[in-house]
């Protein structure tokens, strides 16, 4: 137990750990309370055109090669964009060094699956400030599907009326052609293809 942890004290020398992209630094702690405490500055940057768009990249992850899409997407995101990330999908990009915009890191790690709540709180707060709906914000949701937790995130977003969600790299096995048609018609959900598209 705890006595063993105290006694063994870890590695005898520094033991570097890297993320999936080889990065050795990860900045975390950007749940809604941290982001919203800087909302004034973020809103100013949006109004000044210094932040042109916000991407939320998150969801469940897996080992399939197509999942590099999320890393590639983050790397290709223009320098005047922020990336909110959460859940296991964040490990595809949270060790990238993409710089900052006026002191705000371009990658904001909001936490795990349950912290999708934080991303929703931030989106709703921004919509209130700009007197618009979440769908009218300069915001794109890029969700990675792998297991049931991602369904909870997706259903929550759909229940809030959020549209234009990008979903992939594969679709849930239980989504029939008819269900997919309804999702596309009512919510304009799109299956991811290539980063360039």
PLM regions with names:
Residues 28-34, 57-62, 111, 142-146, ...:
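Glycine- and other small-residue-rich loops at beta-strand/loop junctions that grip anionic moieties
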Residues 38-136, 160-165:
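Hydrophobic alpha/beta core scaffold segments
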Residues 10-30, 51, 105:
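Gly-rich Lys/Arg/Thr-decorated short loops/hinges at beta-loop-alpha junctions or inter-strand turns
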Residues 26, 41, 136-192, 196:
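Charge-patterned, long linear interaction tracts outside catalytic cores
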Residues 12, 16, 65, 78, ...:
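Proline-rich intrinsically disordered, low-complexity coils
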Residues 20-42, 67-68:
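Domain-scale recognition of functional cores that engage charged ligands
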Residues 1-6:
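Short, small-residue-biased leader/transition segments that mark boundaries at the very start
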């Amino acid at each position: 137990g705890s006595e063993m942890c105290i006694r063994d004290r870890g590695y005898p020398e520094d033991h570097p750990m890297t993320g999936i992209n080889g990065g050795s630094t990860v900045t975390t702690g950007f749940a809604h309370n941290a982001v919203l405490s800087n909302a004034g500055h973020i809103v100013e940057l949006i109004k000044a055109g210094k932040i042109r768009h916000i991407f939320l990249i998150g969801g469940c992850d897996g080992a399939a090669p197509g999942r590099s899409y999320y890393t590639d997407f983050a790397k290709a995101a223009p320098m005047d964009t922020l990336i909110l990330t959460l859940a296991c999908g964040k490990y595809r990009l949270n060790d990238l060094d993409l710089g900052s915009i006026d002191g705000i890191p371009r990658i904001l790690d909001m936490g795990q699956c349950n912290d999708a709540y934080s991303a929703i709180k931030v989106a709703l707060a921004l919509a209130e400030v700009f007197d618009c709906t979440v769908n009218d914000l300069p915001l794109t949701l890029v969700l990675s599907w792998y297991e049931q937790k991602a369904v909870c995130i997706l259903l929550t977003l759909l229940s809030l009326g959020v549209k234009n969600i990008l979903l992939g790299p594969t679709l849930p096995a239980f989504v029939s052609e008819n269900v997919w048609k309804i999702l596309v018609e009512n919510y304009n959900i799109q299956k991811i293809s290539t980063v360039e598209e």
